[in-house]
Swiss-Prot record:
<comment type="similarity">
    <text>Belongs to the CinA family.</text>
</comment>
<dbReference type="InterPro" id="IPR008135">
    <property type="entry name" value="Competence-induced_CinA"/>
</dbReference>
<protein>
    <recommendedName>
        <fullName>CinA-like protein</fullName>
    </recommendedName>
</protein>
<dbReference type="InterPro" id="IPR050101">
    <property type="entry name" value="CinA"/>
</dbReference>
<dbReference type="InterPro" id="IPR001453">
    <property type="entry name" value="MoaB/Mog_dom"/>
</dbReference>
<dbReference type="InterPro" id="IPR036425">
    <property type="entry name" value="MoaB/Mog-like_dom_sf"/>
</dbReference>
<dbReference type="InterPro" id="IPR036653">
    <property type="entry name" value="CinA-like_C"/>
</dbReference>
<dbReference type="Pfam" id="PF00994">
    <property type="entry name" value="MoCF_biosynth"/>
</dbReference>
């Protein structure tokens, strides 16, 4: 099997000053191309360390994606490290120098002398085009390993991987068929509870069940070879049955996007009134393109469930909205949710402890619970479901 590795460079990545989103994206993208990464490393802006790890990984990896260090500043060392590791010098790539000069001229700017460094590549390097930036990429062969050097800017990195590097890999190597990965996301059950229920299922050969907990949700993944797809899809029915009402969506699209599409399909507008969630619902739904109108965030205040229900019913009518959703303030470990619909207003009062999780996580949990209420109503289900450590202490319905 082809051994594909990634090397991230830069002090800011090594010291955790920025999150290495490029590594996460590449690992996921390559996995779905049938190229799962076998190793990831991170090295700072130190020439000796870079040369050492390039030489070391060249003895083990078939392909190494090196990210970062192609800029114009003194701490951008990837080209020099590659040349040093190979025992050769840097040469000026005249065509790329002219392309950079054109790039700056079209934007009404003069190219700084330091940018010339970005056109200096190892003597044996294969040039890789960057259509959206000034940091060209390049490839070199070192021992057994084909190394690709890529810019750290995420938008430039992704374009280069998708349009330049992946075609080269397909041309050079016989790539395996991508694996099958079935995913669903749950809300309201713990990881251990789900695992205890699912561990009794018999997995087909080469198939694994994975769990990813990211409060307040848990993602279940069934991954295996394409040859087992039929058996996996049959097993997936059992997985969904066991997960039961905790399933909130399948795939990777996300709940806000799926709710937004359903609202649009059914021509429902939605108004929001948020206290404890502080605008999280509006943010998540607006990013997904939901048909929102007249959303508000107001200071937290103590309310009975009846007050929240009557208030959101009036708000729906006053704004001529199809639906209206409210999250009250959090007082004495209690909080209200209310959803006003053409069928009536449905409200829940819940209780949960303030000591177990941070404020930010509690806000995320409540936003997810509100979205799940909306999802369940849109699907014709009762708005209340099991939520693990969240206790529903009161419910009410106001007729139309």
């Amino acid at each position: 099997m082809l051994k594909v590795e990634m090397l991230s460079t830069g002090d800011e990545v090594l010291y955790g000053q920025i999150v290495d989103t490029n590594a996460a994206w590449l690992a996921d993208f390559f996995f779905h191309q049938g190229l799962p990464l076998s190793r990831r490393n991170t090295v700072g802006d130190n020439l000796d360390d870079l040369v050492t790890i390039l030489r070391e990984r060249s003895q083990h990896a078939d392909v190494l994606i090196v990210n970062g260090g192609l800029g114009p500043t003194s701490d951008d060392l990837s080209a020099l490290a590659a040349a040093t590791a190979k025992g050769e010098g840097l040469v000026l790539h005249e065509a790329w120098l002219k392309e950079m000069e054109r790039y700056f001229h079209e934007r009404g700017r003069v190219m700084a002398p330091s940018n010339r460094k970005q056109a200096e590549l190892p003597a044996s390097a294969e040039f890789i085009n960057n259509p959206v930036g000034t940091a060209c990429g390049f490839a070199v062969q070192l021992n057994r390993c084909l190394m690709f050097f890529t810019p750290g800017v995420p938008s430039e990195f992704k374009v280069m991987v998708e349009h330049e590097i992946l075609p080269r890999l397909r041309e050079r190597f016989s790539l395996p068929q991508p694996p099958v990965c079935l995913r669903l996301t749950t809300f309201g059950r713990s990881e251990s509870d789900l695992a205890q229920s699912l561990d009794t299922l018999q997995l087909p050969p080469g198939v694994t069940m994975g769990y990813r907990s990211s409060m307040p949700i848990i993602e279940l993944k069934l991954t295996g070879p394409a040859s087992e797809q039929q058996a996996m899809e049959k097993l997936w029915l059992d997985v969904k049955r066991v997960a039961g009402q905790s399933v909130i969506f399948e795939g990777t699209e996300g709940l806000p996007a799926q709710i937004s599409r359903e609202l649009q399909n059914r021509q429902f507008s939605l108004t929001l009134s948020e206290q404890f969630t502080g605008g999280l619902l509006a943010l998540q739904l607006s990013r997904a393109g939901a048909p929102l109108l007249a959303c508000e965030v107001i200071p937290s205040q103590e309310e009975t469930l009846a007050q929240t229900a009557h208030w959101i019913t009036e708000r729906r009518a006053n704004h001529f909205a199809g639906l209206a959703l409210a999250v009250s303030g959090f007082e004495n470990e209690h909080l209200n949710f209310a959803l006003a619909t053409p069928d009536g207003t449905f409200a829940l009062r819940v209780r949960f402890s303030t000591t177990r999780y941070s404020l930010a996580i509690r806000q995320e949990v409540c936003a997810m619970m509100a979205l799940n209420m909306l999802r369940r109503w849109l699907n014709g289900q009762d708005i209340a479901s099991e939520h693990g450590w969240i206790e529903v202490v009161e419910s009410m319905t106001l007729s139309v």
